[in-house]
Amino acid sequence: MWVVPGAPLEQGAGWRIWYSQDGDADFRPQPVTVAKSQQPQPIDEEWNLLARLPEFHRRIGVLTVRLRQPDPAGPVYELSVPEAERGAPFRWRSLPAGVGQEGVTFLLASCFWRDDDKEGSYTAGVQELTRRWSPAFKLLAGDQLYADWPIGNTDLPAVEFYASRYAEYWGDALYRELLQTSPTFFVCDDHEFWNDFPERQIQVPRTWLPAERKITAQAGLDLYDRFQGCANPAPFRWYGFRIDPVSFFVVDSRSRRDPFNKQPRPPHFLPEEQWQDLERWVHQLTGPGVLLIGQPAFQKDGDWRDHSLSNFPEDYGRLWAVIEESLEGHTADGRPHDILVLSGDIHTGRFAVGRRGGLDAPEGVPELIASPASMIRPGSKEVEEPDYRFTVHHRGRATTWQVDRNPAAGVPFMTLANNVAAVRMGLGTNGRIRFELTLWQVRPYDSRSWWERFTGDPAPVGPVIELFRKEIELR
């Protein structure tokens, strides 16, 4: 039995716990017991067993555990889950209702290529950061597995292929230990399916023909929904949650992305219903917003090998218009509220700040990227710099943004080290929220050549160390 915590419930109400059992038979997990400071806590449970998927011979379900007497402060609870086969209970926080004197910490990570980290450096790093920071949750920002690399057995039916790749990752006890460190919010990016999804890729034979590409895409989506999406808040692929006064919105810019073809209409990276949810979220802000998106906002145009958000000019302009709406005060309380952007994808840990003339936004638009947790091979040899100046268009209006650049001062910060971010939110001055942003090395960058690898030169090793720290106060 595989057991992984999903997203916590808002207002400290409890948790979602994901289960997967081998075979086709129905099942229901044994009751969970919950304690706080070793005192038993009354709970209610709701079990949702997902429908069988043809050619997939595992059953998956989500157990919702609700505290009858929730503590809005988000303390640590001890959860005993019999199927997890642990000698000790899990120690998970509930989701705080608000940012208080103690603050709230969460982790951010993306891009885990297991083939280069089977020894578990990523797991050990997250375990160490969990001991240091006691995070309330973690945000996994995409590419939680690489379904497309290595290519694998191309003779397997699509569902069996994706199931086998998830079994390599979720079936790895070390990776499950990482997932079990704290409750988890998931969002997908391309490698849950294949590179630059939904585009045809020369190195992925399953994508060459339209009919097979459609079958493969549906299989990838079905397995993503079962292994990751079903453990999120509704509507599962994109969603929001709140830790008052901070509001989070998790954007899925991948699973419903249009193929990149400007005819007969411009392509989109978000469906209209997600746009409406995102715009409604901005208009309901009463404090800082945190926007998690699988690809960075400050990114140069990609090409046929890998498209960026900026390759979709209509949606890219609309995204920046949404951010401007918040900074201009088109919010629930009529005040301007800052947006912190979080992302992954680019195999560079990075912090950058964008600014637009005429906006009263002292902190600009800060963007923190945690990537990669484990670098794919062949991997990046140079850091991925942001687009330092770009113009977007929305409803006939052009706006130009500039990203702060001062190489002598290390601005923007960039690293190739395998990394994880920790973000701590606390009370700031004048009603603002202080965000302490840090990036941590979980494994050094491996710069060995193919020959050095072939001849057995050892991979670099190193401790968990802080690479970057920045404090900002957001309205």
Predicted regions and their residues:
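Metal-dependent phosphoester/phosphodiester hydrolase catalytic core
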Residues: 1-475
